């Protein structure tokens, strides 16, 4: 018995080092995980307070329609209930999109480097992959991506801000792309880091569905909202796309706790504002530090920074582990001589700067 032939070419996702692993391997008490772009401030206190008063019937299947969260989110975003789908993280919706729209002989277009699961799930459906390198600053080259579309293109994957570079294209660039993109090609706009965008970079993406029937926008509660451990995200598009995805979605794909937690988190926008303010402050300070150190970096509109390292990113990663800092080496992201650093709390970032300064001094 064998699986699909393509699976012989793929590998399971390899997660980064976990805190418990570092504690065991290095005998450290002070450990800071800056590898997975999680929210260092956790999540809204209102979530814990509200959940403590809830009575969960764990022997009962969850609400397959995600009714309460659907109502809360559609009211906040001013969309119709038929225009939204929920998933176990927005990643599940990526998987649903591949299952729904990729047919034999299809190809998909994406940037490189970008979020790897676009490619992974597309390959599982036997799609041809067309990868267009980002420019030297880490931005999508939308004109070249447009030029690579042909009669067999099923999906174009756009990630903004892009993971791992942090770059975000402008609304004008996106509109030009969409105006020239064939209407039968699905355009997936992944805004996992949407809440971190500054207003001048906001694409007003939810309004695009009125003009472009081939666009779906993905967002998540895993990043700024801090609910990564509960796995819940959503997609917004016209009702025709949503109905198609619902046909391949599992009937109970988001759990009861995640649904409730997301609803309560959504109500606490002060927490999101605080997260944004602290992230911007600490990101800016870290950029200034790197400038003083003489290290380069990619501009970022998210809660992470892709840092250009003077030697192998893997070597920098290994060095930082010895001092309790977990980052993501660029060699695992397809960008050698870089590390991706999640922006942490102020004191943790100051400690990281001390270690990097020491490392740079040792390099001579």
Swiss-Prot record:
It is an enzyme of class 2 (transferase). HAMAP family: HisC_aminotrans_2 (MF_01023). The modification N6-(pyridoxal phosphate)lysine is found at residue 223. It catalyses: L-histidinol phosphate + 2-oxoglutarate = 3-(imidazol-4-yl)-2-oxopropyl phosphate + L-glutamate. This is Histidinol-phosphate aminotransferase 2. One of its GO terms (molecular function) is histidinol-phosphate transaminase activity. PANTHER family: HISTIDINOL-PHOSPHATE AMINOTRANSFERASE, HISTIDINOL-PHOSPHATE AMINOTRANSFERASE 2. Disulfide bonds: none annotated. Keywords: Amino-acid biosynthesis, Aminotransferase, Histidine biosynthesis, Pyridoxal phosphate, Transferase. Belongs to the class-II pyridoxal-phosphate-dependent aminotransferase family. Histidinol-phosphate aminotransferase subfamily.
């Amino acid at each position: 018995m064998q699986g699909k032939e393509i699976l012989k070419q793929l590998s399971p996702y390899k997660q980064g080092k976990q805190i418990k692993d570092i504690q065991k391997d290095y005998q450290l008490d002070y450990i800071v995980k800056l590898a997975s772009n999680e929210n260092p401030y956790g999540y809204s206190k209102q979530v814990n307070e509200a959940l403590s008063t809830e009575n969960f019937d764990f022997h009962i299947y969850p609400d397959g329609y995600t009714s309460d969260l659907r109502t809360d989110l559609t009211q906040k975003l001013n969309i119709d209930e038929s225009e939204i789908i929920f998933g176990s993280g927005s990643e599940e919706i990526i998987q649903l999109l591949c299952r729904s729209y990729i047919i034999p002989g299809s190809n998909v277009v994406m940037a490189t480097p970008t979020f790897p699961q676009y490619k992974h799930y597309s390959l599982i459906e036997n799609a041809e992959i067309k990868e267009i390198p980002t420019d030297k600053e880490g931005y999508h080259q939308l004109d070249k991506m447009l030029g690579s579309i042909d009669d067999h293109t099923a999906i174009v994957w756009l990630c903004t801000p892009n993971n791992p570079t942090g770059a975000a294209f402008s609304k004008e660039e996106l509109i030009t792309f969409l105006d020239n993109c064939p209407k039968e090609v699905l355009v997936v706009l992944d805004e996992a880091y949407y809440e971190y965008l500054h207003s001048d970079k906001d694409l007003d993406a939810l309004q695009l569905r009125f003009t472009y029937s081939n666009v779906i926008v993905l967002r998540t509660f895993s990043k700024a909202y801090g609910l990564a451990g509960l796995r819940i995200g959503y997609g917004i598009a016209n009702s025709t796309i949503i109905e198609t995805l619902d046909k391949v979605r599992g009937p109970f794909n988001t759990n009861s706790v995640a649904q409730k937690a997301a609803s309560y988190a959504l109500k606490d926008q002060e927490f999101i504002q605080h997260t944004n303010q602290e992230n911007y402050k600490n990101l800016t300070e870290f950029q200034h530090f790197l400038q003083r150190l003489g290290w380069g970096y990619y501009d970022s509109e998210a809660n992470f920074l892709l840092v250009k390292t003077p030697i192998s990113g893997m070597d920098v990663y290994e060095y930082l582990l010895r001092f309790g800092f977990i980052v993501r080496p660029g060699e695992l992201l397809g960008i050698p001589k870089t590390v991706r650093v999640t922006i942490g709390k102020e004191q943790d970032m100051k400690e990281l700067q001390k270690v990097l300064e020491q490392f740079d001094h040792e390099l001579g």
